[in-house]
Amino acid sequence: RHRSVPNARSPPSPLSPMPDDSKPALVDANIFLRHLTGDVPEQASNARNLLERAERGEESLVTTVLTVAEIVWVLESVYELDRSSIRAKVVAILGLPGLTVEDQEILLQAIVWYEEKNVDFADCYSAAWMEHHGLEEVYTFDRDFDRFEGLTPLRPE
């Protein structure tokens, strides 16, 4: 039943160098969290300054899927925000000018499903990744995958 997936890997991220050929810098979750929450005022101000420099083209920034997943987890578990608020904040991050985000389309679908289906973000990302790559079957014991149209959860025997 297992099928080979020749193109299941994501293509390399398009990391565009700045005009002076410098490489982009990775932005960690805490920078986004300070920016989004405003707590630790000095750090929040510094985070905003960094993101504004990127918006003006003075900095080239990148972030990863795992960073976005960490942001979702912290906003949910530490800040106890509702899913709608978390979705709005993640969409704002994904739309920041000057920031390249790994698998941005997949993340956008995942955060929509996170709010709509009340499924944990990691499962939403996996379902969105599957859809993006044309996969339909997932081996899992997790019943949450039953909520995704077009996916067939398989229970190993």
Where is each model-derived feature located?
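Structured helix-beta-strand junction loops
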Residues: 57-58, 96, 117, 148
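Short loop/helix-cap segments at secondary-structure boundaries that form the rim of catalytic
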Residues: 144-151
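Short active-site oxyanion
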Residues: 57-61, 98, 134-136
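Acidic catalytic patch
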Residues: 65-66, 89-116
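Conserved residues at the C-terminal ends of beta-strands
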Residues: 141
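Acidic, metal-associated active-site segment
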Residues: 120-137
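Short, well-structured N-terminal submotif of metal-dependent ribonuclease cores
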Residues: 1-63, 78-85, 91, 156-157
